[in-house]
Amino acid sequence: MSKNIDWDNLGFGYVETDYRYLSTYKDGKWDEGGLITDSNVVLNECAGVFQYAQTIFEGLKAYYTKDGRIVCFRPDLNAIRLDESAERLVMPKLPEGRFIEAVKEVVKANKDFVPPYGHGASLYVRPYMMGTNSVIGVKPADEYQFRILTTPVGPYFKGGAKPIKIRTTDFDRAAPHGTGHIKAGLNYAMSLYAITDAHNQGYAENMYLDAATRTHVEETGGANFIFITKDGKLVTPKSDSILPSITRRSLMYVAEHYLGMKVEHRPVHVDELKDFAEIGLCGTAAVISPVGLIHTKDGDIHVPAGMDDMGPITKKLYDTLLGIQHCEIEAPEGWIVEIC
């Protein structure tokens, strides 16, 4: 029985659900973990997460398919990425298989919060890990919590995705050889000033450039870029300081194996921006957000696809990946994980 929620008017924000998952790391090992009902986290004031930002997270969705199943999309890649993030911040990896089993457990427990099929909504699943014991000197914590919260969210774009205006920026999202390739809370904190400034100037997002030379495209504060050339190729930026987006990897596969497109994953110079036919941002929340204009220090670049609608090739990519996620198009093996 679904909760008494107005699914048609559900926003993209936090709604507390009944259960969350908790596992604790202490004395060099993880406990068995399990579901809890308390949504509050109580920690010592000197916990590593507070003092030195030792926290990482993931994001994925659970949703109903047309035939009444609840599924998730490629959670194995979220598990791998969380492990990679943990290693970089000197945090313990989870026991093998724990991530997916925990996701299944918490989604099943909160299945009444999974929006009905056809509303464009989903149950957002947020796994995260943090250092929890008191740490006054700069060093890794000794104790950790791995938690998963869930919250029902409406469609990222109500009424469909309309092209947005973005800008290039001299702010840096990540340093060379830094933490840009992992999903750490500190990366997102660094982007808050820049995104607030962008919004104040009338832009939806920042296009970060490489910190060393300011000549190559990186990503935004929370999404990878995709570019469509005038001859129909999909191009995605390559850099060691870009977060390896699961949505971007999936779109590259869809482009090549479902739509027969040529795909290039390579460094993208800023001088190329004026030559692309379509530009978009990709990520878990919106799948693809089309870009219609890029403001640069040399002037505005008007993307040929325009400011009215998503470009035709971007739309095919969007519709195909969405169809795969919702089991309306046959998925590659292992992409769809059934919860219940």
Language-model segment annotations:
Residues M1-A102, V106, V135-C340:
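Helix-start/capping segments and mature chain N-termini
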Residues A109, G131-T132:
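Intrinsically disordered, low-complexity linker/loop segments enriched in Gly/Pro
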Residues D112-G118, V138-P140:
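Short, charge-rich binding segments
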Residues P115-R126, M130:
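Extended, Lys/Arg-enriched charged tracts that mediate electrostatic binding to polyanionic substrates
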